[in-house]
Amino acid sequence: MKTLLLTLVVLTIVCLDLGYTMTCYNQQLSQPQTTTTCAESFCYKKTWSGTIIERGCGCPPMKPPIRLKCCRTEKCNN
């Protein structure tokens, strides 16, 4: 009985993927829309003079004149 219970617990953990992942856009400039699955809990969008120059996972440090917008919801960096 204990073996069956342990097997069910392990199977549940493997199937549910307890590590949370997030989906962020990662296309550059005018490329077609693409997404990536991220382990980080942020997505970001870099802009320069009003033009989006980079998208991705995380929230990297940035210095002016490049602007950085970080967000915490699925596909929020479009």
Swiss-Prot record:
Disulfide bond entries: 24-43, 38-57, 59-70, 71-76
Signal peptide: 1-21
Gene Ontology cellular component annotations, sorted alphabetically: extracellular region
Transmembrane segments: none
GO MF term set: acetylcholine receptor inhibitor activity; ion channel regulator activity; toxin activity
The keyword Lipid biosynthesis appears for this protein: no
Gene3D superfamilies, A to Z: CD59
Keyword terms of this UniProt record: Acetylcholine receptor inhibiting toxin, Disulfide bond, Ion channel impairing toxin, Neurotoxin, Postsynaptic neurotoxin, Secreted, Signal, Toxin
Pfam families: Toxin_cobra-type
InterPro entries in the record: Snake_3FTx, Snake_toxin-like_sf, Snake_toxin_con_site, Toxin_cobra-type
Tissue spec: Expressed by the venom gland.
Main location: secreted
Record's subcellular location: Secreted
Recorded family membership: Belongs to the three-finger toxin family. Short-chain subfamily. Type I alpha-neurotoxin sub-subfamily.
Function: Binds to muscle nicotinic acetylcholine receptor (nAChR) and inhibit acetylcholine from binding to the receptor, thereby impairing neuromuscular transmission.
Entry protein name: Short neurotoxin 342
